[in-house]
């Protein structure tokens, strides 16, 4: 499993999940519960919708999530979306495995 963990935090509380597709990238967050996880958000798709803004709104609605955790999650989501978009703008295709190696703290799934 891959985790978003704040510095000094004993146990990670959230996992950023990415659905890596040719025409879209989708992001979601799971909450770590014990030794497992539970979905915290739906998947938000880019560029079909503004995935980053939708994720931000969803996280802000959960008042028990610390601001530092929200920022960490959103910063990582920004990196992943920008990476996918930059590759697409250059006409390049990258496998999910390559994306996973660039972002080892993120959990990827997809069709390639």
UniProtKB/Swiss-Prot annotation:
It holds the Pfam family PSRP-3_Ycf65. One of its GO terms (cellular component) is ribonucleoprotein complex. GO terms for biological process: translation. Signal peptide: none annotated. Keywords: Ribonucleoprotein, Ribosomal protein. GO terms for molecular function: structural constituent of ribosome. Belongs to the chloroplast-specific ribosomal protein cS23 family. Part of the 30S ribosomal subunit. Probably a ribosomal protein or a ribosome-associated protein. This is Probable small ribosomal subunit protein cS23.
